[in-house]
């Protein structure tokens, strides 16, 4: 079954954004650190995309985080593939005072949008918006694992659940 690219783009972006948050450090460091620090590197994983007609499709993703201009910013690249196709999303993520914000673009379909969210005790909550995309995401960080859940609004897609592993 072919999924709409808007849904796949949203799902991939959701993964990226959700992965962009980690919990605050447990020990008091001498210098301020960012909850984004633990994200730097490569994450891979898979999950399922739920569709309103009751079907689901397997999805595999690779997410790479590179430090940007400051310790509170990251550049992110997300590549996901399913039977319905593939996407590539690039994002710029900023952390400030417990909040996450930024922008994203899907390179092959020329889609763009914004993200905004907050840090939670176990990860973060984020809202992803774009011209034809609205989604709510929750991310739970547990050591080298990220569990990402995305709920799509006004879409033929219901949601996306992914498990990513750092390495």
Which sequence ranges carry the predicted segments?
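Bacterial N-terminal signal peptides that target proteins for export
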Residues: 1-12
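Bacterial N-terminal signal peptides
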Residues: 10-20
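Signal peptide processing junction and immediate N-terminal pro/mature segment
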Residues: 21-28
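Central antiparallel beta-sheet cores of small beta-barrel/beta-sandwich binding domains
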Residues: 28-140, 152-166
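Preference for long, well-ordered alpha-helical segments
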Residues: 146-148
């Amino acid at each position: 079954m072919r999924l709409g690219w808007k849904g796949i783009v949203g799902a991939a972006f959701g993964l990226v954004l959700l992965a962009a948050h980690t919990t605050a450090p447990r020990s008091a460091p001498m210098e301020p650190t960012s909850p984004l620090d633990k994200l730097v590197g490569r994450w891979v994983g898979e999950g399922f995309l739920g569709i309103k007609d009751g079907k689901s499709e397997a999805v595999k993703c690779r997410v790479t985080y590179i430090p940007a201009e400051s310790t509170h910013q990251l550049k992110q690249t997300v590549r996901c593939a399913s039977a319905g196709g593939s996407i590539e999303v690039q994002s710029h993520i900023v952390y400030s005072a417990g909040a996450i914000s930024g922008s994203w673009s899907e390179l092959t379909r020329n889609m763009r949008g914004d993200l905004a969210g907050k840090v939670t005790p176990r990860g973060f909550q984020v809202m992803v918006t774009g011209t034809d995309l609205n989604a709510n995401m929750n991310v739970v960080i547990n050591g080298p694992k990220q569990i990402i859940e995305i709920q799509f609004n006004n879409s033929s897609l219901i949601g996306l659940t992914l498990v990513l592993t750092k390495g």
